[in-house]
């Protein structure tokens, strides 16, 4: 078991990860501006340090564990403005880039064993006002269309270079739209109009998949850097995936292997390299 610092552990996905890592026996330090603020993990015994991670000095001190959990071995970096609609483009870019660089640089200086961090599906071309080149989109389909997506693409490059300088492995997880159980109540509102969720090719990722992918990334036999799309194995829609593509993105090539409600965010690399195997589907709830 390891001592793990989770930045942004008070956020929606961060809380899920903190809870899961503790349940699997790790010692976890949540580093965030604010402590936990809702009932996702009311009884989770996570240590906490407040920090402004856009400040390198605060990032360095917090990631050392301070007197709260000294000797941090692994960093899981989730702290960020979480989407293109949560602030102005300039605020998003400045905050996300500055904090990511500070966290990565501090992790390298402290000599941690590994960094696992939240990249994003937005790197792939969301919101797809420009149709995708093909479907399902894979890790090579890089079209950042917002300052948020650009901050993630440049975060991946920062990870690559800081890994090269330090020798520390960096694993980037390009999460789809994260869902916790309460979010599934909204799914029926998507089903009548396929255009409502075309912006991410009808993708989603369940909280259980997020937790699973982080745990797998902790154990990946990796050197250097790598990035993986992390999504559910299906879409948010009842209609078949090919039918959705033909209606909303006519003419876009769809791989022959796609059938039924298969995801259009390619998770083959995560399956092959990480052993990622997302079992949960919202279809069990309706």
Question: Model-derived features: where do they sit?
Answer:
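Conserved Rossmann-fold NAD(P)-dependent oxidoreductase catalytic core, especially the SDR/UDP-sugar
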Residues: 102-145
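N-terminal Rossmann NAD(P)H-binding glycine-rich loop of SDR-like oxidoreductase domains
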Residues: 4-24
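Glycine/proline-rich active-site loop of Rossmann-fold NAD(P)-dependent oxidoreductases
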Residues: 165-169, 180-192, 216-227
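C-terminal substrate-binding subdomain of Rossmann-fold SDR/epimerase-dehydratase oxidoreductases
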Residues: 208-286
